[in-house]
Amino acid sequence: METIATRLAILPFPEIDPVIFTIGPLAVRWYGLAYVVGILLGWFYARRIVQNAALWRNGTPACNLTQLDDFLLWAAGGIVLGGRIGYILFYDLGSILDDPLRAIQIWNGGMSFHGGLVGTTLAMIIFARRNAIPIWSLFDVVAAVVPIGLFFGRIANFINGELWGRLSSVPWAVVFPTGGPFARHPSQLYEAALEGLVLLAVLAWFVYRRKALKIPGLVTGIFVCGYAASRIFVEFFREPDAQIGYLAGDWLTMGMVLSVPMALIGIWAIARARSAAAAA
């Protein structure tokens, strides 16, 4: 006998146009809007953190608002360039070599968080040195707000019907337009919840309740560990990229491989921050 859960599990995902609206030749897409909204909300939240002197050691924020505003463009460049280059290198090098023009077609999707993290980290290092900003404190401010962008990015992935999960019969499983006739885990929403909402709340608790910004590098380490743990967990429900597949057995994915060193770096950053604080 068919149950409500079974009927829910075979509901097709409504095919949503990736283009929200057009203005002449300009097409506004969900993917691009997610990046813009995520960056702007993250910038707004970062300004509030920097303005709150009580969160900082000796009441001195890592940077002033003018410097933070200037960094916005650097951050956007690091995210987009690093994310795209990372995706090409980690996930789609063969296809790009066959059709090099695909490398610049960002509007069709294809961004790597790990690549974006590397790009943004390089942007922060250069910007901090140019402006005499304590690098670990700048890392901490950015780390505290990154989950906002992750949340909106994963919601855009869901709307676009991309990066879907593995086959599933859970009541909330979804039949995606490009995922075949079978229901799948909405793994984009799992990531939006864990990497976005949950991680944002955890970091906010450390920032506001534990005053973690007074220990440079601690928030960064917590973010990196939290993201790595969330990503590795969700990878068990997410379908691997078709052009790569599983790296070993039917479980090891590129996302897991890239997240393991992240977790180790996060643990090191936390240990380093605590050691430096104890020695101060």
UniProtKB/Swiss-Prot annotation:
A Pfam family that the UniProt record links to this protein: LGT
Keyword Transcription regulation: no
Membrane-topology annotation of the record: Multi-pass membrane protein
Entry's EC annotation: 2.5.1.145
Record field: transmembrane: 30-50, 71-91, 106-126, 132-152, 188-208, 217-237, 251-271
Cellular-component GO terms for this entry: plasma membrane
InterPro entries documented for this protein: Lgt
UniProt pathway annotation: Protein modification; lipoprotein biosynthesis (diacylglyceryl transfer)
Catalytic class of the enzyme: transferase
Keywords, sorted A to Z: Cell inner membrane, Cell membrane, Membrane, Transferase, Transmembrane, Transmembrane helix
Binding site for a 1,2-diacyl-sn-glycero-3-phospho-(1'-sn-glycerol): R154
Source species, domain of life: Bacteria
Any one GO MF annotation of this record: phosphatidylglycerol-prolipoprotein diacylglyceryl transferase activity
GO biological process: lipoprotein biosynthetic process
Location relative to the cell: Cell inner membrane
Protein family per UniProt: Belongs to the Lgt family.
Function: Catalyzes the transfer of the diacylglyceryl group from phosphatidylglycerol to the sulfhydryl group of the N-terminal cysteine of a prolipoprotein, the first step in the formation of mature lipoproteins.
Protein name: Phosphatidylglycerol--prolipoprotein diacylglyceryl transferase
Gene designation per UniProt: lgt
